[in-house]
Amino acid sequence: MNINATLLGQAISFALFVWFCMKYVWPPLMQAIEERQKKIADGLQAAERAAKDLDLAQANASDQLKEAKRTATEIIEQANKRKSQIIDEAREEAQAERQKILAQAEAELEAERNRARDELRKQVATLAVAGAEKILERTIDKDAQKDILDNITAKL
């Protein structure tokens, strides 16, 4: 094999080229590749975190929805209980008012009945005195008449 200057020059040039590439070209390429690998790994981690966060958010939303439904059910139950309580109170108040009105009407009726009895007693006494006057054919003075009327009224 014949080694001449051209081959030696090519070998030196190739060695210089390899050294130059290793010194100046290779590090930026490796850095770019490493940065790209890091970005891809970070992107995959972010996607995994996002998927976990989505699952967690869906679970939280489901829990909140269940809690809201439970709260709504409780509020409806409380409203129904309050409604029943208000109806019962109104019914009791109406019953009490009814009893009050009936008692008042009964008292008024009794008072009217007593007044009518007293009036009838007075009329009967007046008629009795008038009849007695005619029978006796004399007039009784007012004081004596009043005493007689009161006496008769008390007896009736």
UniProtKB/Swiss-Prot annotation:
One of its GO terms (molecular function) is proton-transporting ATPase activity, rotational mechanism. Its main location: membrane. It is found in: Cell inner membrane. The gene is atpF. Pfam families: ATP-synt_B (PF00430). F(1)F(0) ATP synthase produces ATP from ADP in the presence of a proton or sodium gradient. F-type ATPases consist of two structural domains, F(1) containing the extramembraneous catalytic core and F(0) containing the membrane proton channel, linked together by a central stalk and a peripheral stalk. During catalysis, ATP synthesis in the catalytic domain of F(1) is coupled via a rotary mechanism of the central stalk subunits to proton translocation. Component of the F(0) channel, it forms part of the peripheral stalk, linking F(1) to F(0). F-type ATPases have 2 components, F(1) - the catalytic core - and F(0) - the membrane proton channel. F(1) has five subunits: alpha(3), beta(3), gamma(1), delta(1), epsilon(1). F(0) has three main subunits: a(1), b(2) and c(10-14). The alpha and beta chains form an alternating ring which encloses part of the gamma chain. F(1) is attached to F(0) by a central stalk formed by the gamma and epsilon chains, while a peripheral stalk is formed by the delta and b chains. The chain crosses the membrane at residues 7-29. GO terms for cellular component: plasma membrane; proton-transporting ATP synthase complex. It is a single-pass membrane protein. It comes from Vibrio parahaemolyticus serotype O3:K6 (strain RIMD 2210633). Gene3D superfamilies: 6.10.250.1580. This is ATP synthase subunit b. SUPFAM superfamilies: F1F0 ATP synthase subunit B, membrane domain (SSF81573). Disulfide bonds: none annotated. Keywords: ATP synthesis, Cell inner membrane, Cell membrane, CF(0), Hydrogen ion transport, Ion transport, Membrane, Transmembrane, Transmembrane helix, Transport. The keyword Nucleotide-binding does not apply. InterPro entries: ATP_synth_B-like_membr_sf, ATP_synth_b/b'su_bac/chlpt, ATP_synth_F0_bsu_bac, ATP_synthase_B_chain. Belongs to the ATPase B chain family.
